[in-house]
Amino acid sequence: MATRVLSMSARLGPVPQPPAPQDEPVFAQLKPVLGAANPARDAALFPGEELKHAHHRPQAQPAPAQAPQPAQPPATGPRLPPEDLVQTRCEMEKYLTPQLPPVPIIPEHKKYRRDSASVVDQFFTDTEGLPYSINMNVFLPDITHLRTGLYKSQRPCVTHIKTEPVAIFSHQSETTAPPPAPTQALPEFTSIFSSHQTAAPEVNNIFIKQELPTPDLHLSVPTQQGHLYQLLNTPDLDMPSSTNQTAAMDTLNVSMSAAMAGLNTHTSAVPQTAVKQFQGMPPCTYTMPSQFLPQQATYFPPSPPSSEPGSPDRQAEMLQNLTPPPSYAATIASKLAIHNPNLPTTLPVNSQNIQPVRYNRRSNPDLEKRRIHYCDYPGCTKVYTKSSHLKAHLRTHTGEKPYKCTWEGCDWRFARSDELTRHYRKHTGAKPFQCGVCNRSFSRSDHLALHMKRHQN
């Protein structure tokens, strides 16, 4: 090693300063190695050399152990003083102090990949681009290994996803019956994203329910209305109307409010069980008017047959006539209030203190004063207020029928003109007599009077 160092020093040139007797071999070995113009650059390029010299420097042999080569000329010149030698040695100690090796720089192609970016780093390497003929499905990762929060399908989703908490869904499944299975199945996805869409139905405690846009919600309202109609008309309502009518109406109001609440929540319940449950509720303290209390069913006289034609323009009117007519007294009261604003808005109904005196046509004293036309036919006691009425009555005894129907092909004759007019309406279909309550029309006035008795009761 000493021979190699001396040969390197011989090529660099003679040393200008003669070294000290003891330290001269050490400086002669180190100066050719670290004596470059830029020591920092040499240390960066050769990080191991500085450590190697620092490691071998304490073990260097003294100069007398190695004989000088005869080919090297003896050094001539003045020797350094002790002060300069100490200063030079201190300066050299700065270059000979052991330093930590710099952090090795790992090339880009040897960089360790992270787990979350392993599928991305392989597309940003410095290698040459791949030809377009290679199928890119080889480089696509498996979709099932991706997290659901980082993946979003680019295709437009066909189904509507409605998120509901799992606790609420389990509570509804306990209280209500499960709905029937839909007749139309969900669409099947054959793309590569089908495995993600058929993943676990519960993500972060959120229940994902997939359903198609069907008109089931719109069809549920009429069924609830049917339940409400059944609820009000069910025979299970055993409520006495004479003993506790107020409590019965309270129970009915509670059942109506519960049925209306069922329309909003779309919950189906059996009407009979609902009525049984509502009967156990305590009654309220308010009272109802007498006209709204349930009354005993009264006998309705049969309405005369309607001779309306089955034309399409009267179908809507016939459907309206199917509903029960309102109260006759309320209709008359509203008409009187319109014509006479000074009259009170309400009339006494079913009043027991004041009963109007009703007169028959034969016992009315006012009519008795005006009846001056008597029938002189033997055995007939008819009396009329007008002479025309008496003449028409006398034709019934004589059998005279001067009024003949003028309709083509009709040979009917009548003794009275009003009978001919009534008969002629059968040919024309005219119905001049109309009910003011339900707008039902009749061809005869007596049929209208018989129909009005249904509104009175």
Swiss-Prot record:
UniProt keyword terms in alphabetical order: Activator, DNA-binding, Isopeptide bond, Metal-binding, Nucleus, Repeat, Transcription, Transcription regulation, Ubl conjugation, Zinc, Zinc-finger
Residue stretches of biased makeup (Pro residues): 65-80
SUPFAM superfamilies on file: beta-beta-alpha zinc fingers
Motif window: 9aaTAD: 118-126
Posttranslational modification: Ubiquitinated. Polyubiquitination involves WWP1 and leads to proteasomal degradation of this protein. Deubiquitinated by ATXN3L.
Segments of this protein annotated with the region Interaction with WWP1: 324-328
Ranges where the record places region Disordered: 1-83, 295-321
The keyword Repeat is annotated on this UniProt entry: yes
GO biological process, one term: negative regulation of transcription by RNA polymerase II
GO molecular function, one term: RNA polymerase II cis-regulatory region sequence-specific DNA binding
UniProt effect for mutating P301S: In a colorectal cancer sample; somatic mutation
Alphabetical list of Pfam families matching this protein: zf-C2H2
Zinc finger (C2H2-type): 373-397, 403-427, 433-455
GO cellular component, one term: nucleoplasm
PROSITE patterns: ZINC_FINGER_C2H2_1, ZINC_FINGER_C2H2_2
Covalent cross-link Glycyl lysine isopeptide (Lys-Gly) (interchain with G-Cter in SUMO2) as placed by the record, residue numbers: K31, K52, K94, K110
UniProt entry tagged with the keyword Zinc: yes
PANTHER family associated with the record: KRUEPPEL-LIKE FACTOR 5 (PTHR23235:SF82), KRUEPPEL-LIKE TRANSCRIPTION FACTOR (PTHR23235)
Assembly with partners or alone: Interacts with WWP1. Interacts with ANP32B; this interaction induces promoter region-specific histone incorporation and inhibition of histone acetylation by ANP32B.
Record function comment: Transcription factor that binds to GC box promoter elements. Activates the transcription of these genes.
Domain notes for this protein: The 9aaTAD motif is a transactivation domain present in a large number of yeast and animal transcription factors.
Family, as annotated: Belongs to the krueppel C2H2-type zinc-finger protein family.
The name this protein goes by in its record: Krueppel-like factor 5
Organism: Homo sapiens
Gene name of the encoded protein: KLF5
